């Protein structure tokens, strides 16, 4: 009886040991998967998937006639694909918003974010950034004839429109603490709300607001920019090889004239030195 009990006990320990080893192996595989090299996967798949805006005039906007997404960010992404994979047509695009872009990157839905994304210390905790590829500043868009001339005019009773998940939404609460902030899912919704009278001003980066003012001549930017908003291209944390390739591409673009060409095409002026 004791012998049978001992054999049963040994068998039980063996099962537990095997299960533990199997679990360790699975965790190891999961760990390896989470650290998978994005650049290597891009080269294996022969494509690079960028998360881009589709509602931001001048930077990323879907052309209703062709169905293609067009803008500054799109052209920059295409040139990165050309430098990494040899062909700009190997760039693929998925729509993101300020709210969805980081989760989509972390889930592996996209390889990189090129979507008017400001480099901040808070975001650096979640993603890694490339070098700055565009210098913007937060400003206000108002209807022509508005009494609002600067952020200082946004007092009690003022309503400011912003986009969820954006640094602009956070900044305006600090710069105009007495104003009410209404948040929307994207810039198109926020601009529609401004035009329908739901707010007194719309706030985001001046580069984005220029596109809105260009679209509707009844609106204009007012006051000076009240923040610095350096845009960067985001990749998953730890993907230093991909970030290095992107930085090399940006540097090459600026040295061979491609960057200036794209800048003038969309922003209609020379890049600031």
UniProtKB/Swiss-Prot annotation:
MF (Gene Ontology): ligand-gated monoatomic ion channel activity
Broad class of the protein's primary localization: membrane
One Pfam family of this chain: SBP_bac_3
Subcellular location: Cell membrane
Signal peptide: 1-20
Lipid attachment site numbers (S-diacylglycerol cysteine): 21
Induction (UniProt): Positively regulated by TnrA under nitrogen-limited conditions.
Keyword Lipoprotein in annotation: yes
Membrane-protein topology: Lipid-anchor
Transmembrane spans: none
Lipid attachment in record (N-palmitoyl cysteine): 21
UniProt KW keywords: Amino-acid transport, Cell membrane, Lipoprotein, Membrane, Palmitate, Signal, Transport
A GO biological-process term: amino acid transport
Protein task: Part of the ABC transporter complex GlnHMPQ involved in glutamine transport.
Annotated family: Belongs to the bacterial solute-binding protein 3 family.
Protein's name according to its UniProt entry: ABC transporter glutamine-binding protein GlnH
Biological source species: Bacillus subtilis (strain 168)
Lineage: Bacteria, Bacillati, Bacillota, Bacilli, Bacillales
Gene behind the chain: glnH
